[in-house]
C-alpha cells in the first residue's frame, strides 16, 4: 500500500512559455498580463492569457498550477 507522498503543493505544476506581453494591470501596475503557451500536460500547445505577478519577459518559463482558468482582457474605462 505505497502511497505517493507530495512534498510540495507545486509538484503538479505545468510549464508554460511566455509568447506575448499584453500589458500591465492592477491598482499600481504590479501585475503583467501575458499570453502563455502550455509546454506539457493535457493542454499542451494551448495558448492562455494569464496574469503574472513579478518580473517577466518574453521567453520566460512560467510554472502554472492549473491550465483551465484564463484572465479577463485588460479594458480601458
From Swiss-Prot:
A GO CC term attached to the entry: cytosolic small ribosomal subunit
Record keywords: Ribonucleoprotein, Ribosomal protein
Cross-referenced InterPro entries: NA-bd_OB-fold (IPR012340), Ribosomal_eS28 (IPR000289), Ribosomal_eS28_CS (IPR028626)
Keyword Ribonucleoprotein: yes
Protein name (database record): Small ribosomal subunit protein eS28
Single Gene Ontology BP annotation: maturation of SSU-rRNA
Taxonomic placement: Archaea, Thermoproteota, Thermoprotei, Thermoproteales, Thermoproteaceae
Pfam family, one: Ribosomal_S28e
GO molecular function terms listed in the Swiss-Prot or TrEMBL record: structural constituent of ribosome
Similarity comment: Belongs to the eukaryotic ribosomal protein eS28 family.
Keyword Repeat appears in the UniProt entry: no
